[in-house]
Structure formats: structure tokens, C-alpha cells
């Protein structure tokens, strides 16, 4: 959620810059005194707004969220249609300039890039965090995740092709790449439209993630892994307000002091780690419980598919720097300490 908020801030700063407006340097970047930046204020403000909205009435906010998704698709359509008329096939002359890369420990190539681009596939698991509010979750949750993955992967492929066809990849090391590409080819109206839509719709991503994370904290508290305070719900809107406040405050602090690249790397490696554990759990579950019931989702090709997933995830994890591994280790230690000193004693399982 923090990293998405940082991306939102980047698009807003890009839009403001196109009109000649800039924030003071001290409040326009992550904490780095040597560069004169101390806090990235915009992501903090948007997360405060998102948290406040969810505390008031999460169901109404989620309805607004669904409407804004339509705007998001319209911005992608504008970019694709405009970009098709400005493609330069020479930009695709060397489709893999750094090759495949190394299976383990690489810094360049497809593997290293894939380990970072994995960030674009985060969030789908949040659907499973709302099972208490979904009809027939055994059927609809897996179907929703698979369908969303198919749609989004297809869009990613098309947008990436157009993006690299319009602007050479060496010039795309920016946080607002789509809007930058449109400005690069001189289509300012489309760039501004994409920026405005991104500013509006990235808020919806923050809302979805904040909603899912607060429900995860609520579920952990309900099961005894976190203090019972976090399972309390407000009397008026039936919102887990303490859980929502916790996720909002921690995310706002992170978005204000850490860079987008660092947050993305930490989120990626953490997600890859739990996907490894998920694949292992699936193998064990299939062995102990047998095949799913008739109306339940059945993962195909077990154990081949989970084993392949483990290998791929570990390969991606090996691409990260020791700094990312250190941050991941600290996060694991904090989580383990919470479980050891509280969750183990109070768990209902």
C-alpha cells in the first residue's frame, strides 16, 4: 500500500511539474538528508485520506472504487491507441539487451527484471482476505483471482509493448512511465489525462489494499495472533477501526520515509516467501486431505505445479541485494517475536 501511494505521489508531482509547479524539495522525496529530502509528503497525505474514508463507511468507498476502475481502463485505452501511432520498431531491435540473466544472484537480465516486475502482480491475494464478505467463497474467490490475473497479464503485455515501442527502454527509468512516454512524443493532453486518471485510480488501489490489510489484521486478532483490540468494530459503520488505523499509520510512515524502489523490493521478497510457503502447504494439504470436494476449487498438476512455483519464487528471491534480504530478515524477526510473545499463548489454533 505504501509503494502504491508513492507511485500516486509520483504521478501527481509529474502532473504539477507539467504546469510549472513543484513542491519544496524537503517534502518531495524519501528521507535522505544528503539530498535535501526528509519526507515524501504526498503519499502520506493520500494514505491519511484513504484511512479516513475507510473509517467512515468502507462499503460506500468500495462502490466508488468499482466506478473508478472504469476510468482506469479508459486511460490505458487512450495510451494504447495514441501509442500505436507513434511506435518505433527500432526500439524492439534488441528485445533482451541483457539476456536471460542468472538463475541465482543476477543483477541484470530477464530474471533480475522479472524479480522486480513481480511487484505488478501483487494485490490479487487480497481477494482471499475478504472471504467473510463473499458469496460462495470456495468457488468465487479462486475464479476471481484467476480471471483477474488473465485480464491484467494481457493488459500488462500490451501496455509494455506499446511503452517500449514509443520510448526506448533506457529512457524509462521514471516513476510515471506511461505519462512520461506521452509527454515524450508531444501528446500533452493524453499525458495529462493519464496522470489525472492515475491520480484518481491509484487511490482506489490504496483503498483496496487498505481494506484487505485491515481485514487481515482483524482476522489475525480474531484468531488470537494479535491483541483483541484489533478485532473491535465501530458501532456505527461496523468497521474494524483499530485495525484500519494500525495499517493506515504504519503505511503512511513507510511511504513518507522510504523510496519506492526499496519498498517494492521488500514487498516483493516478502510476497515471494509466502508464496513458497503456500506451495509447500498445498502439497502437504493435498497429501493429508486428498482431493478437494466437488464444489471446491482444485489446483491442477499437484505436486508438479507447486514445486515449479517454489523453484521460480526462490530464483526470483535470489536476485535481491543483501540490503533487501536484511530488511526482510528484520521483518521476519519482528513477526516471529509477535507470535512467540503473544500469538503462541493466545492463538485459538
Task: Locate each region found by the language model.
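Hydrophobic transmembrane alpha-helices that form the core helical bundles
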Residues: 1-47, 52-55, 199-219, 259-273
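Alpha-helical transmembrane segments of multipass membrane proteins
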Residues: 51-52, 80, 160-162, 199, ...
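Membrane-interface loop-to-helix entry segments
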Residues: 9, 38-89, 145, 264-277, ...
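Select transmembrane alpha-helical segments in multipass membrane proteins
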Residues: 42-46, 103-117, 158, 183-207, ...
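Helix-loop-helix junctions that connect adjacent transmembrane segments
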Residues: 20-41, 67-196, 324-327
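Hydrophobic alpha-helical segments of multi-pass membrane transport proteins
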Residues: 14, 75-79, 216-217, 267-295, ...
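Loop-to-transmembrane helix boundary motifs in multi-pass membrane proteins
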Residues: 39-44, 135-156, 188-191, 218-256, ...
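C-terminal membrane-solvent junction of multi-pass transporters and transport-like membrane proteins
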Residues: 35-39, 229-241, 275-325, 345-349
Amino acid at each position: 500500500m505504501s509503494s502504491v501511494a508513492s507511485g500516486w505521489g509520483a504521478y501527481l508531482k509529474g502532473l504539477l511539474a507539467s504546469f510549472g509547479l513543484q513542491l519544496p524539495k524537503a517534502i518531495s522525496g524519501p528521507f535522505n538528508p544528503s539530498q535535501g529530502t526528509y519526507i515524501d509528503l504526498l503519499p502520506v497525505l493520500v494514505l491519511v485520506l484513504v484511512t479516513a474514508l475507510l473509517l467512515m463507511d468502507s462499503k460506500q468507498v468500495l462502490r466508488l472504487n468499482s466506478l473508478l476502475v472504469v476510468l482506469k481502463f479508459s486511460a490505458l485505452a487512450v495510451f494504447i491507441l495514441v501509442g500505436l501511432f507513434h511506435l518505433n520498431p527500432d526500439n524492439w531491435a534488441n528485445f533482451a539487451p541483457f539476456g536471460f540473466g542468472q538463475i541465482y544472484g543476477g543483477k541484470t537480465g530477464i530474471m533480475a527484471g522479472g524479480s522486480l516486475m513481480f511487484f505488478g502482480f501483487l494485490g490479487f491475494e487480497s481477494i482471499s482476505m475478504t472471504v467473510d464478505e463473499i458469496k460462495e467463497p470456495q468457488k468465487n474467490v479462486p475464479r476471481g483471482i484467476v480471471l483477474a490475473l488473465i485480464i491484467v497479464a494481457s493488459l500488462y503485455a500490451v501496455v509494455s509493448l506499446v511503452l517500449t515501442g514509443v520510448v526506448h527502454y533506457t529512457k524509462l527509468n521514471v516513476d510515471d512511465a506511461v505519462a512520461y512516454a506521452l509527454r515524450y512524443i508531444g501528446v500533452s493532453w493524453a499525458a495529462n489525462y493519464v496522470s489525472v486518471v492515475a491520480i484518481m485510480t491509484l487511490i482506489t488501489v490504496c483503498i483496496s489494499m487498505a481494506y484487505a490489510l485491515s481485514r487481515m489484521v482483524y482476522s489475525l486478532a480474531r484468531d488470537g495472533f494479535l491483541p483483541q483490540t484489533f478485532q473491535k468494530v465501530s458501532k456505527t459503520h461496523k468497521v474494524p477501526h483499530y485495525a484500519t488505523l494500525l495499517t493506515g499509520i504504519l503505511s503512511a510512515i513507510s511511504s513518507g520515509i522510504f523510496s519506492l524502489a526499496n519498498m517494492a523490493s521488500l514487498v516483493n521478497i516478502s510476497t515471494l516467501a509466502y508464496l513458497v510457503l503456500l506451495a509447500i502447504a498445498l502439497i502437504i494439504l493435498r497429501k493429508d486431505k486428498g482431493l478437494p470436494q466437488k464444489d471446491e476449487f482444485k489446483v491442477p498438476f499437484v505436486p508438479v505445479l507447486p514445486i515449479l512455483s517454489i523453484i521460480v519464487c526462490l530464483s526470483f528471491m535470489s536476485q535481491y541485494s543483501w540490503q533487501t534480504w536484511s530488511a526482510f530478515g528484520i521483518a521476519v524477526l519482528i513477526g516471529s517475536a509477535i507470535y512467540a510473545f503473544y500469538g503462541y499463548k493466545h492463538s485459538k489454533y
